[in-house]
Amino acid sequence: MIGVIFGVIVPYIAVAIFVIGVIYRIVNWANSAVPLKIPTTGGQQKSFPFIKRTIYDRFDSPYTWWETAGRMLLEIFFFRSLLKNTRYYLDRVSQKDARWLWLFGILFHYSLLLVLIRHSRFFLDPVPSFVETLSEIEAFKGVFIPSVYMSGLAIVAALFLLWLRRIFLSRERTLSLPSDHFALILLLAITISGNVMRYFVKADLFAVKELLMSLMTFNIGHAVEVANTIEPIFYVHFALASFLLAYFPFSKLMHAGGVFFSPTRNMPNDNRARRHVNPWDPADVPLLAKGITVAGRVYKSKKLDWDTYYSMYTDQLQEIEEADYKIVPEEL
């Protein structure tokens, strides 16, 4: 009965919650307005022709969509922002290199990628050759029995380091929420139980693959039959993974999809060349004036009726009038 609950029912519920939750979050992000152009950058923005920009500036402060795409690729695959991580101390007027966080992040994410690729053998038949090759490369074949996979140990080490950072560093400890600790503990529990099943308490992997293939093909009857033959250690690992899958769309782990919708990352820094229209601006504002003329010079603004414009900038306009300048509405 436990095998049926945690091997058949719980996984289907978890996948359904995961799919619905991810779609909901993505649709919600896609429909969210971006009132301001706020790409975070430390590079030189494209300006006058005589101001030269380096390759670094092109990707850190992108002007075209191709440069923005390059920036996004660097962000997704190499964590560009974390690589520039520097901690500043205002009270001591000093700074400290904190790129160890980038190292921990790279170690965790790429170890997770390798682990997921290796786990794909349980869902595919036949197993692709590149999965077999990758497993051969990262395993210490002939040194240990059974073979030791580097990614399986590296992901546990990376998660411990990321969790210790939130525990022992005062600033991170103050900013950390219970959900931050919970996500790391859940990931640690999954990876540790997987390593225990790999090296200490064995499970019948042929039966595991048969169960997962039955779930993939919706062969419920066969899945129920196989589920009752698998050792309990597998269901500890599988239940934790199912819970993570259901929890994923409603946690900070959803940054895996949210990074594609982040305006600080996916917008070109072209404020000087293109005007960003705020989608929240009301569409029914009377379009009667587009600015003012002072001493023969036109100062453009939003296209408003003169009374509205004057009420918005009363103090500034009165100062200009007191300086004996004549103000003329710039008519359309």
UniProtKB/Swiss-Prot annotation:
InterPro entries cross-referenced by the UniProt entry: DsrM, Heme-iron_electron_transfer, NarG-like_domain, NarG-like_sf
Record field: transmembrane: 3-23, 97-117, 143-163, 177-197, 230-250
Membrane topology per record: Multi-pass membrane protein
UniProtKB keywords: Cell membrane, Electron transport, Membrane, Oxidoreductase, Transmembrane, Transmembrane helix, Transport
Places the protein is found: Cell membrane
Gene Ontology molecular function: any one: nitrate reductase activity
GO cellular component: plasma membrane
Entry superkingdom: Archaea
Broad class of where this protein is predominantly found: membrane
Coiled coil: none
One example of a Gene Ontology biological process annotation: anaerobic electron transport chain
Annotated PANTHER family: NITRATE REDUCTASE PRIVATE CHAPERONE, REDOX ENZYME MATURATION PROTEIN REMP FAMILY, RESPIRATORY NITRATE REDUCTASE 1 GAMMA CHAIN
Xref: NCBIfam families: cytob_DsrM
Quaternary assembly: Consists of five subunits: an integral membrane subunit, a cytochrome b-like subunit, a cytochrome c subunit and two iron-sulfur subunits.
Name of the protein described by the UniProt record: Hdr-like menaquinol oxidoreductase cytochrome b-like subunit
Native species: Archaeoglobus fulgidus (strain ATCC 49558 / DSM 4304 / JCM 9628 / NBRC 100126 / VC-16)
Taxonomy of the source species: Archaea, Methanobacteriati, Methanobacteriota, Archaeoglobi, Archaeoglobales
